[in-house]
Each structure stands twice: as structure tokens, then as C-alpha cells.
Amino acid sequence: YDRGRGSVLSDKIKTVRNNIPDKEVTFENAWGICDEDIFNKMITVADKQYKDGKPFFNFVMTTSNHRPFTYPSGKIDIPSGTSREGAVKYTDYALKQLFDKARTKPWYKNTVFIIIADHCASSAGKDEIDVANYHIPAFIVNMPEKHNQKIQKQCSQIDLWPTVFSLFNWHYESDFFGKDVLASDFEQRAFLGTYRKLALMKKEKVMILS
């Protein structure tokens, strides 16, 4: 178990860490294995859970978008280790490989994929709040019986789960600070933070809360 921590859904749900054998690793650097390898492992785990008749929630963190931005050679037209743009393009490549494989699986039709950046408290430095560094995309993919749409609202990562649960039409009780961004009464705002400061942003104005 991952340090005994539970899940956002229930303390009864435990986080299990999966080790990856060396034979399943084609490329790695100081941060970990390449995106293709971790996605392949995710599919293997999903296959086993489906075969065993168990639902699954797989959480994956990719490593390519970290310095020195290295990844397997011959995958894209930007040499490994030269730029962040190359790392992002490789991740795009790896995601395409993931979805090409996932679509062939029997569990795909009942599986929702969420892709989002994982900005941490230090992403904008220790002191200044650089708003541009917190502007990130999020994708909700393969949501059953939902039409594609592009949402351009000022919101935060904390709003992700309430929005997803709303799309599922789930009724639940929680201590979430986030809100459903698709709700008619959603008030646009964003929370930003570093190790030292927490800020609230509304439209073009930013207020330091602490």
C-alpha cells in the first residue's frame, strides 16, 4: 500500500503500488520509465482487473516532461534531450499509442480517461505567483453518452472530480472544495499556490489569501 493512504472516494479503498519488472522497461532516466512503458503497464493492470471481474481506477504519472527531457529515440522528429517541446510531442505520441491499444480492449467502452497536468506547490517558485504557469489543459475522454464539447472557464484542478461525478449523474456527500464547472450556478475562479502563498483569482484579479 502507498503509505497507508486511502482514496478520495473512501477510506476503505487502498492505494496499491505496482512494480514494473525490468523486462517491461524499454527506456528510463532519473525520473523513471518512459511514457509508453507506464501506459503499457496500465493496460496490463486493467486487463487483469477486467479478467478478475473487478472495477479499477488507475492513476498514472508520466515522467517525460521533466528535465533533461529524454525519451526513446526514433519515436518523433525531435531528438531526445533537446527541448521541452520534444518531451510534450513524445507524450502526445505515447498517448496515441495508449488509446490505439485501449480501444481494442473489452473494458474500453466502460472506461473514462482523464488527462491533466500535475502542477505542484512549487510550480511558480517559492514567492511569486506567476498566473501563466498555472494555465493548464484537462481532457475527459470516452465519457459515455456525452457529446464532445470545449469548456473555457476559469476553474481549478479541485473542480475536476465534482465535474466528473456530475457527468456520471452520481449523488454523493463529500468535503470537496471544488465545484461542478458545468453547473448553471458555477462561479468562475481559480486557486493558485506555492509553498508560501495561496491565492484566489477571479477574472483578471489575483488576491493573496495567505
Language-model-detected regions and their locations in the chain:
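Solvent-exposed soluble domains appended to multi-pass membrane proteins
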Residues: 1-210
